[in-house]
Amino acid sequence: MTYKLTVTTLALTAITSTVAATHAKPDTEHPHIVLILCDDMGFSDLSCYGGEIHTPNIDYLAEQGIRFSQFKNTGRSCPSRAALLTGHYQHEAEMGWMTAVDEHRPGYRGQISDHLPTLAEVLRDQGYATYMSGKWHVTLDAAFETPNGSYPVQRGFDKYYGCLHGGGSYYKPDPVYHNLQRITEFPDDYYYTTAITDSAVSFIKQHPTQTPMFMYIAHYAPHLPLQAPQDKIDA
């Protein structure tokens, strides 16, 4: 199965009017950065790129931020994520394939190389507070809950909420982590897309004033399975 990843927008502005009211903008040399990634969505699905689906909020972000006209897509999700997070070709990042297994040969180690810094590590060294909410999918499945894992908080992110691989379900994804703590219980009305967004908003609200922020939001949607919130199904 071929996977498509779409970088929705890279917004180099204050995040929302609510955040702007409570957190002053950092200096112009260190702008806030919000990177939003959607899984299995073609770029032309968005109205700001000519799509037929009306996406006014995303269009606003695109208008106020930066729109990519070119991006290397490997045709598989994990290698594309590794390229995005490191700025290197996927084989240089040791992510030539998926995360299921370490093939013990160059370019196919199943997770981002320790020898390459991630975008979060680079920005944190420049004084940024770094946050991630959503799908990681660039560490070995066998490394979950082991000391040699390559989790977001081990690769430059100060705070993390989300699923380390695809997730499999919007109602009860697995494995979900808050930083390095695994979450196993979910409320009855849990919905993964909403949880990712709520977590990102929470990180922003807790963000200290005058500190530049890098926020990486990696949604699982609209990746299969097609599961809507229960209240939408019942409506």
Annotate each language-model stretch with its function:
Residues 2-19:
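Gram-negative bacterial Sec-dependent N-terminal signal peptides
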Residues 14-235:
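Formylglycine-dependent sulfatase
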